[in-house]
Amino acid sequence: MRTLKTFALASAATLIATAAQAAPTTWAYSAKTGVGASYEAYVDGAYKAGGKTGAVSKVWFSIADGVLTETMYGLIHEAQIKQMRIAVETASGLAIEGADTTAKTEYLHVDAAGRPLSPAYKITTTDRQGRFVIEKRIFTDPDRNALFVRVTVTALKGAVTPTLLLEPHMANTGGGDMGAASASALTAHEGKAFLSLKASKPFAKASASVLKDGDALAALKATATSAKGAIVLAGELPKVAKSETFDVVIGFGADAKAADQTAAATLKTGYAEVLARYNGEGAHVGWEDYLASLSQLPRLRDASEDGGKLLQASALMLKVQEDRTYAGALIASLSNPWGDTVDATKSSTGYKAVWPRDFYQCAMALAALGDKETPLAAFHYLPTVQVGPKTPGNTGDGGWFLQKSHVDGTPEWVGVQLDQTAMPIMLGWKLWKLGWLPDAELKAFYGKMLKPAADFLVKGGKVNLDWNTATITPPFTQQERWEEQGGHSPSTTAAVIAGLVVAGDIAEAAGDTGSAALYRQTADDYAGKLEARMVTTKGTFGDGHYYLRLNSDQDPNNKSPVEARNGQAPVAEDKMLDAGFLELVRYGVRRADDPAILASLPELDDEALEDLYRVRYSFKFPGVEGSFPGWRRYGVDGYGEDTQSGANYGANNQMRPGQRGRVWPIFTGERGHYELALAGLSGKPDPAALAKIRQTYVKAMELFANDGLMIPEQVWDGVGADSAHAYVRGEGTDSATPLAWSHAEYVKLLRSVSDGQVWDNYAPVKARYAR
């Protein structure tokens, strides 16, 4: 929902007065309205210098509440900055961006229809008392490790004095930094990570101080020019009588000299030239060129309801959120969920990491756009996160894919999720059938990656990695797609069946007919037992006949308790509704009019259920006719804000019974895909059916996006207290924005509508089970 953000976190004066209650060091607010990085062209499928975009820039930035927030340099998860705000001294007192301003996010470079052409932003923060306006233009230098911010301060009620307040989090932590300040630069470093902030005009005053009790504003009174620990760097800009523009560059490097020289070089190159290179204007190769390479973009625009604005933003977001050292390493989000209450004293990736499931969604969406290079790079990357003899600490069976890992393949979470082992096979088959993955290469990957994965989906094995010593017996998964429960999961099993069927095709192409037969036979076995394992006929809701979210044993009618998670008390499995069964239709395992599928929809869509169990919610938006559907992950989901206090999920490292997972835009896209499959049972859907899908599901996802065209992980459902952030119903929460999967689902829905058939459907699976 695109609204001007107007809530007040706290005034500058209040922040000073209450700083003693603040956490000493955290990350920033996670509802980003913008993220960006330079477009870098591959050289032989890798990121290295010498290609048409020259040197490789490895800097990413994010924006929230009008403020520059987490900025990464090096690997995509290596944050070096928490935030940079501007404090303004006025005749009537102090004001600080975020607390005392409203914020508006716009794209700096758009086409004639207003569609974004690059992830460069114009951020306008306006003082609530009408004393000043600040405009920031933010982008990176595509030829250097530098961030460029053009700042224009306009005084409206007398002269004002702006001061940059930079909070470094060098080496991805909020402590242990060394900082220094002078008239010419603000600098910080920890380990081998260095930054240097330079401005186009010398600082009138500059200081480096230690953050005390979370009070960054205290730096305005500091006089020291060096500090160590959790630090704040302050640089006072010249007084502004009317309107002044300052260019600010933050350079990064492996040592102080490199960072300083980088900042100076970018500043010397200048705003216009750096921006032109970033955008790809004229002879420069940049973001314009990437968008122009997307062969399907023009026709997908026609399937949108906003003229293609969110589509082009989604294309940018998917490509931005790729590492620039490990080509094809697609992460979940450039955010740390509920970051403003997450302890930053220890390094953490947040969502800036690889989950093969999210990764698959992104690669498939990029393929849907007609990007032939990134999905192939992604496929080539996958052995990096497959468990085998070379996985650090592994002494168990391999073939499965890590639950979550750093982009360099370092294991972070080691649960076994069978859908994450199936999806790499599904991606490989898709790229092969598109004609992008040659037969010879497919056969090579069959031996080294795809066959071990398919074998694990058949036989499972004994895991021995870190804490995990489980014996896996497919299709029973140790964790389903929400990483919380073990059992028979409709969504997981849908992917496993699809993965095995297409693995049969790949094995046959590789000459391994014995394995091909085994994979198909096993898929048939799993498919034949779906309803017996996962459909209850004695459920609590509706007529009692529906798919379970998960069954922890072989009997779907015994009301076994689901394990307690996220602060929630255990409930019987039949009381936990979700839409995971729709994945059976998406992949072709069941027809859209399958009796068990149809029987499960009334319970899923029942808006009369009490909020604890209810999954579907309808939303209205100001000035927009109609209501629009959204769904939670499942009933009794605790992955969200506390309904009693409004506190963030997991605040103070505590799980609370009042926590509640909200509505995820992903599921609006998933339902749109189901409705498309239903409309196409007898052939291509008719125009009226397609129009309804666009006006309902496509439009809803567009409305869930914020003014920066970022689609959140979760949107506020209006249930319970919201004292912390004053969310508007249908607005993104502090969980994670942009979520790459949300953008991927939107793109895939447009491709599916444009094609008149589900993009993620697998023809051999459908031919086998859903004719």
What residue spans do the PLM features occupy?
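Extended ligand-binding clefts on enzyme/binding-domain cores
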Residues: G174, A188-K212, D302-L310, G398-T410, ...
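Acidic/His metal-coordination segments adjacent to aromatic residues that form catalytic metal sites
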Residues: P337-S348, G399-V416, N464-H488, N557-G567, ...
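Aromatic-rich carbohydrate-recognition surfaces in CAZymes
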Residues: T154-L156, G179, A188, Y271-G280, ...
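Acidic/polar, glycine-enriched structural segments that form the non-catalytic walls/loops
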Residues: A23-A31, R128-V133, D141-G350, K372, ...
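Active-site acid/base region of carbohydrate-active enzymes
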Residues: R301-I331, H380-L402, M423-S491, Q521, ...
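Well-ordered alpha-helical scaffold segments within catalytic/enzyme domains
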Residues: T152-T154, L294-A303, L316-Q321, Y360-T374, ...
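An extended acidic
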Residues: T25-T125, L195-D213, H284, E288-S304, ...
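C-terminal capping/lid segments that line or modulate ligand- or cofactor-binding pockets
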Residues: A12, P24-E78, L402-G428, S560-A564, ...
